Amino acid sequence: MGFPIPDPYVWDESFKVFYQLLDDKHKQIFQGVFDCAKDPSSAAKLQKLIEVTAKHFSDEENMMQQSKYSGYPPHKKAHEEFLGKLRGLRAPLDTAGLDYCKDWLVQHIKTIDFKYKGKL
C-alpha cells in the first residue's frame, strides 16, 4: 500500500518537487487524469493526457541527463512502462484503467520523482 490517492484528484503542495517546470507539468497531468475521469468516453481527453505525459517525461528526462542524475536509467524505464500502458488504453476508460493512472502518478511522484529533489 502506497501513498493515498487524493479525492478530488488534484495536485497539491505535497507533490512539489521544487522545479517549477516539472511541478507545472505534474499539475497538467493531474488535470488530464481528472478530465478523463470526469468524461471517460472522451478519446480526445485521453489523447491530450498521453501528449502532456509524453512531453513531461521528455522534459524531465532531459533535465536528468543534463545534470548527470544517477537515477536516470530506472526512472526512464518507469516512464516508458507507464507511457506504454497509457497508450494502450482506449476510450471509454474503465474504472480499473483510471485507478491505475491515478495510483501510478501519485506513487511515482512521491517515491521516484522525490529522489531527484535538489539534484537536477
UniProtKB/Swiss-Prot annotation:
* Chain sites annotated for binding Fe cation 1: 26, 56, 60, 113
Keyword annotations = Iron, Metal-binding, Muscle protein, Oxygen transport, Transport
Q: What are the recorded GO MF terms, alphabetically?
A: iron ion binding; oxygen carrier activity
Question: Which InterPro entries does its entry note?
Answer: Haemerythrin, Haemerythrin_Fe_BS, Hemerythrin, Hemerythrin-like, Hemerythrin-like_sf, Hemerythrin_metal-bd
* Record: residues binding Fe cation 2: 60, 75, 79, 108, 113
Q: Which CDD domains does this UniProt record tie to the protein?
A: Hemerythrin (cd12107)
- Which protein family is it in? Belongs to the hemerythrin family.
Q: Which PANTHER family match?
A: BACTERIOHEMERYTHRIN
State the function annotated in the UniProt record.
Myohemerythrin is an oxygen-binding protein found in the retractor muscles of certain worms. The oxygen-binding site contains two iron atoms.
NCBIfam families named in the record: hemeryth_dom, Hemerythrin
What's the protein name? Myohemerythrin
Question: What species is this protein from?
Answer: Sipunculus nudus
